[in-house]
C-alpha cells in the first residue's frame, strides 16, 4: 500500500512539472505612458493667425495720404556746381499733392514666400544732379546698375544704417556701376559726397511683393500669393505705418495708409 501511495505522489509531481513547462511567463504590467507636455498657451498679445485662404494669387492695391498739412519744401542750393545750378529744384523729401496724396512711399508685404532674384536689372540714374527714382525696391540678389547721365562728376556713397557699403566716384561717360545687395529687409541710402542734396533709397527684400506710391498716392503690388499678411508703408521723413490684408485668388485686396505729417522717421 505504501508503494501504491508513492507511485500516486510521483505521478502528481510529474504532471505538475509538465504543466509548468507549458505555461507562459506572466508579462510584467505595462508601464503607463508619460503624460504629454502641455503646449504653451497663445500669448494674449499675439493671437493665433487665421487660416490662410486657399491657393492662388491676387493684387494688393491702395493709397497713401497725408492728413495734415504737408511741410513746405525749400529750394535746393545747387549753384556750387555750374551744371547742377542751371536747373532750379526743390527738396524732394516730401512730395505730396494739395489734397494730401503722398508719393515716394515704399509699401511691402511682410511674410510673403521668398523668390529668386529676377534677371531684369534695376536702375538708379543720376539725372540733373538727382537720384532717379528717389525710392525703389529690389529683390535680394538682383543686379542694380547705377548710371551717371550728367556731364559732371558724381560720387555714389551707399549706406546701410550708418555703415558704408561702398563709396565710388563716377565720372561722365563711364560704364554703370553694378552691384548686388543680399541683405533682406535692409533700406539702403544713396548719397553723393560731391552734391550733398542728392539722396536716394533702395529697399532690399527676398521677394518681389513691394511697390512705391506714385504722384497720386496710389500703389499696386501684383500677384501676391493668397493669404493673410502684414503690410508696411515706409516714408523717409514720416517713418512706418502698418496694416493687414487678406489676399484671395483673383480678387484685389485694398489697404490704405494715412500719415498725419507730424511723424518722425527712425533708422530703418
Predicted regions and their residues:
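Positively charged n-region of N-terminal signal peptides that target proteins for export
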Residues: 1-5
Amino acid at each position: 500500500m505504501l508503494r501504491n501511495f508513492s507511485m500516486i505522489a510521483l505521478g502528481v509531481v510529474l504532471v505538475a512539472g509538465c504543466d509548468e513547462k507549458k505555461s507562459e511567463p506572466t508579462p510584467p504590467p505595462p508601464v503607463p505612458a508619460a503624460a504629454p507636455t502641455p503646449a504653451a498657451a497663445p500669448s494674449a498679445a499675439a493671437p493665433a493667425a487665421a487660416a490662410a485662404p486657399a491657393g492662388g494669387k491676387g493684387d494688393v492695391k491702395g493709397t497713401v495720404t497725408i492728413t495734415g498739412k504737408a511741410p513746405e519744401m525749400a529750394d535746393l542750393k545747387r549753384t556750387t556746381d555750374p551744371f547742377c545750378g542751371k536747373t532750379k529744384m526743390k527738396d524732394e523729401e516730401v512730395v505730396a499733392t494739395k489734397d494730401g496724396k503722398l508719393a515716394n512711399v515704399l509699401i511691402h508685404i511682410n511674410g510673403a514666400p521668398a523668390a529668386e532674384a529676377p534677371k531684369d536689372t534695376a536702375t538708379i540714374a543720376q539725372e540733373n544732379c538727382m537720384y532717379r527714382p528717389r525710392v525703389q525696391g529690389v529683390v535680394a540678389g538682383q543686379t542694380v546698375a547705377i548710371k551717371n547721365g550728367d556731364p559732371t562728376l558724381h560720387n555714389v556713397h551707399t549706406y546701410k544704417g550708418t555703415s558704408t557699403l561702398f563709396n565710388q566716384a563716377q565720372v561722365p561717360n563711364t560704364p554703370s556701376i553694378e552691384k548686388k545687395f543680399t541683405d533682406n529687409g535692409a533700406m539702403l541710402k544713396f548719397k553723393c559726397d560731391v552734391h550733398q542734396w542728392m539722396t536716394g533709397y533702395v529697399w532690399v527684400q527676398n521677394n518681389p511683393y513691394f511697390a512705391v506710391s506714385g504722384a497720386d498716392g496710389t500703389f499696386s503690388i501684383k500677384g501676391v500669393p493668397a493669404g493673410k499678411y502684414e503690410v508696411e508703408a515706409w516714408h523717409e521723413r514720416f517713418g512706418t505705418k502698418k496694416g493687414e490684408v487678406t489676399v484671395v485668388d483673383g480678387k484685389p485686396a485694398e489697404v490704405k495708409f494715412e500719415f498725419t505729417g507730424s511723424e518722425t522717421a527712425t533708422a530703418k
